[in-house]
Amino acid sequence: MSNTKSELFEKHPEWILQCKNRPLSTGRGGTQIVLDLTNPEVQDFVFSVIDNLMTQYPAIAYMKWDANSCMLDYGSPYSPKEKQSHLYIEHHRGLNNVLERIRAKYPQLILQACAGGGGRINYGILPYFDEFWTSDDTDALQRVYLQWGVSCFYPTIAMAAHVSADKNHQ
């Protein structure tokens, strides 16, 4: 992900998912945008950000991979016209490529997957993450039901959770 008010967007607007001849759609705050992971240059960039962090700060033991935005624009400036219908699949393949590289170089790094709604977890992403954040709802009673429901489909050891004060729904 990126932001329309970032150096990355200024230097590489072609690295953002966007529909040709349409205004750019944005997420939270009116500035959030999604990187085009079908593009190998973008994959390299994302890996380099993590690699640089891990090189500069080798004591990092945990990282939360928060992708709290859905794909707002179903268009890739990188992909040819005949491949646009495969955007979602190719985007996830690009993400998998990045995650494979991170896992290969930093196997000790604990990674937590986190994203909005149904984009939070899927079976294809589980091999790359040690755990996933199931919900921002931290009310203790609601969390019991939420964790129980998710456990019907995913291994409980992979579900991260914490609870907060009573009547707290974040």
PLM ranges: what are they?
Residues 5-44, 89-170:
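Glycan-recognition surfaces
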Residues 48, 53, 81, 95-97, ...:
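Residue-level detector of functional hotspots within protein domains
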